[in-house]
From Swiss-Prot:
Entry EC number(s): 4.1.99.17
Catalytic activity from the UniProt record: 5-amino-1-(5-phospho-beta-D-ribosyl)imidazole + S-adenosyl-L-methionine = 4-amino-2-methyl-5-(phosphooxymethyl)pyrimidine + CO + 5'-deoxyadenosine + formate + L-methionine + 3 H(+)
Annotated binding of [4Fe-4S] cluster, by residue: 573, 576, 581
Keyword ATP-binding attributed: no
Keyword Iron-sulfur found: yes
Organism field: Acinetobacter baumannii (strain ATCC 17978 / DSM 105126 / CIP 53.77 / LMG 1025 / NCDC KC755 / 5377)
Pathway: Cofactor biosynthesis; thiamine diphosphate biosynthesis
GO MF annotations in UniProt: 4 iron, 4 sulfur cluster binding; carbon-carbon lyase activity; zinc ion binding
Cofactor descriptive note: Binds 1 [4Fe-4S] cluster per subunit. The cluster is coordinated with 3 cysteines and an exchangeable S-adenosyl-L-methionine.
HAMAP family tied to this protein: ThiC
A Pfam family matched in the record: ThiC_Rad_SAM
UniProt function note: Catalyzes the synthesis of the hydroxymethylpyrimidine phosphate (HMP-P) moiety of thiamine from aminoimidazole ribotide (AIR) in a radical S-adenosyl-L-methionine (SAM)-dependent reaction.
Protein name: Phosphomethylpyrimidine synthase
């Protein structure tokens, strides 16, 4: 494993060498900058995109750089030496220690974790620098929600406020349409106190396990920028640890705000350790997947004890949020009988099968308060799973789906009583005209806890293009108030996504999230659009490429027809050519208008002269030629 993940090792194949370069390559005209907070160790990363000046012929003005949100971590910082074998540098360790409410344990307390650590068969693939985990001191609660309710502004909250603002005060063109926010708050400036209030009220979460100090704090809530999640993970059919780590770093490079490791294949424990130690963003999991592996895939053999040990195992590794399918109740399972596609959630189907086999209530529901006790000891956030989500548009918004959603609302209140952070997972497959009903009901029954949706996919006829069918729904539900969108790749329903699929899914969902921010009228959301539009009008081609979500693709598409360097300053593109470019024509019209110096009296004299000509020609509109 060490040879596979060492970026400089001669053992790495040529493709892996290229992958390593791709992960650390700085995007064109960009540089990593850090904004300092109220203390020297609050250093908030952003990406600064430099722009060229407007040509003299078009006014000759300076265009200041544009600041954008950056999820890539230190991988794009040339001053940091990347060594995957050692993991990322800690961002939050000092903050956690200063609070003096955690203990460093003498070792892992999870039975399974202890077994894996002693298993000589995993020695070669095990992360070499495993630290003893932290846990809350007896009687202490270490969640960001608990601190927020106590009126405490943590360094994480200040970090997030700086990050969300993206230095908007320095932006030149803040023109923006007002948008329709459906009750969300559009503050011109996010303050640390506002972050605290939103977390205290449960309207936002800061997923940040005390055992993931490498994490760069971020927030999920409808009054903040819309976030996106990327799913990765191995399966029984393939993928290695280094491939999954590469997928994670690749996804964060292009804009994934969180990552879910949905591994169901070999070495789940070790794969997750490598991912967490090298991830600058929160990591989520579905613990029931690994619990099922521990009973050889037989759902009926699952027990609360096995699941509890899995929660502790993953919490001690540093998982930041758990998807828990506690809303799949025994009485709801029959409601899916007449569905076209039944239960499509893996976690939902596992728990439904267990309930039917034992004819007992879902043990995730009956042990929910015990789960909360574990969550608050490590500050793991809930992502309450939608195990009965619709798997096709025909099943959208049915009784099974909405019954579960109402139960998730009940569980949200129970989690909040423990000061545990909660977000709610949503569908699924929903046609456009039925999407808003989902958002409205979620806001009502879950009291504005953040909504986290998979799409939704708006049609079922496009396998291979479901990143598009879902992005349509994602943009809409993001506009209505969803806080985080789970990406869908072109491989959805077809296979395990590769590196290209991951990037395609990320870019597609960055578009959907940004479109939602624009539609909501989120302050500053239009700054980048304005800058790119200005560059386009002024034929600053390089600036257009560099301001785009995917500069590499934009440049390569332009170069397919206009490859020469001289074409980067041409006042046309291959779509219209030099004579029919609307923007060039508009510039000519502007130049003509600016050169008109006629006074009002001159205009009147001209009109009088033309009137006389008209009368001399017999006052006829048309004349024979």
């Amino acid at each position: 494993m060490n040879q596979l993940t060492n970026l400089s090792s001669a053992e790495i194949s040529a493709q892996h060498e290229q992958d390593a370069k791709d992960l650390t390559r700085i995007l064109p005209a960009s540089k990593k900058v850090y904004i300092e907070g109220s203390r020297p160790d609050i250093q908030v990363p952003m990406r600064e995109i430099s722009l060229t000046d407007t040509p003299t012929g078009l006014g000759g003005e300076h265009n200041p750089p544009i600041m954008v949100y950056d999820t890539s971590g230190v991988y794009t910082d040339p001053n940091v030496q990347i060594d995957l074998n050692k993991g990322l540098p800690s961002v939050r360790q000092k903050w956690i220690e200063e609070r003096n409410d955690t203990d460093v344990l003498s070792g892992l307390t999870s039975k399974f974790g202890q077994e894996r650590l002693k298993d000589i068969r995993t020695a070669d693939i095990r992360f070499a620098h495993i630290q003893n985990p932290r846990r809350a001191k007896a009687g202490k609660n270490v969640t960001q929600m608990h601190y927020a309710k106590q009126g405490i502004i943590t360094p994480e909250m200040e970090y997030i406020a700086i990050r969300e603002n993206q230095r908007q005060r320095e932006a030149v063109d803040m023109r923006q349409h007002p948008g329709q926010n459906f009750g969300a708050k559009n503050l011109k400036e996010i303050t640390p106190e506002f972050v605290r209030q939103e977390v205290a009220e449960g309207r936002a979460i800061i997923p940040a396990n005390i055992n993931h100090p490498e994490l760069e704090p971020m927030i999920i809530g409808r009054n903040f920028l819309v976030k996106i999640n990327a799913n990765i993970g191995n399966s029984a059919l393939g993928s290695s640890i280094d491939e999954e780590v590469a997928k994670m770093t690749w996804a964060t490079r292009w804009g994934a705000d969180t990552i879910m490791d949905l591994s169901t294949g070999k070495n789940i424990h070790e794969t997750r350790e490598w991912i967490i130690r090298n991830s600058p963003v929160p990591i989520g999991t579905v613990p029931i997947y690994q619990a099922l592996e521990k009973v050889d895939g037989v759902a009926e053999n699952l027990t609360w004890e096995i699941f509890k040990d899995t929660l502790i195992e993953q919490a001690e590794q540093g998982v930041d949020y758990f998807t828990i399918h506690a809303g799949v109740l025994l009485r709801y399972v029959p409601l899916t009988a007449n569905r076209l596609t039944g239960i499509v959630s893996r976690g939902g189907s596992i728990m439904a099968q267990w309930c039917l086999a034992h004819h007992e209530e879902n043990f995730l529901y009956t042990h929910f308060d015990e789960i909360c006790e574990i969550m608050k000891a490590y500050d793991v956030s809930f992502s309450l799973g939608d195990g009965l989500r619709p798997g096709c548009i025909q099943d959208a918004n049915d009784e099974a789906q909405f019954s579960e959603l109402k139960t998730l609302g009940e569980l949200t209140h129970r989690a909040w009583e423990h000061d545990v952070q909660v977000m709610i997972e949503g569908p699924g497959h929903v046609p456009m005209h039925m999407i808003k009903e989902n958002m409205d009901l979620q806001l009502e029954v879950c009291k504005e806890a953040p909504f986290y949706t998979l799409g939704p996919l708006t049609t079922d006829i496009a396998p291979g293009y479901d990143h598009i069918t879902s992005a349509i729904g994602a943009a809409m539900i993001g506009w209505y108030g969803t806080a985080m969108l789970c990406y869908v790749t072109p491989k959805e329903h077809l296979g395990l996504p590769n590196k290209k699929d991951v990037k395609d899914g990320i870019i597609t969902y960055k578009i959907a999230a940004h479109a939602a921010d624009l539609a909501k009228g989120h302050p500053g959301a239009q700054v980048r659009d304005n800058a790119l539009s200005k560059a386009r009008f002024e034929f600053r081609w390089d600036d257009q490429f560099n301001l785009s979500l995917d500069p590499d693709t934009a440049r390569s598409m332009h170069d397919e027809t206009l490859p020469k360097e001289a074409h980067k300053s041409a006042h046309f593109c291959s779509m219209c050519g030099p004579k029919f470019c609307s923007m060039k024509i508009t510039q000519n019209v502007r130049d003509y208008a600016n050169n008109l110096t006629n006074s009002d009296s001159e205009v009147e004299e001209g009109l009088k002269a033309m009137k006389e000509v008209y009368q001399e020609q017999g006052q006829k509109l048309y004349h024979k030629v």
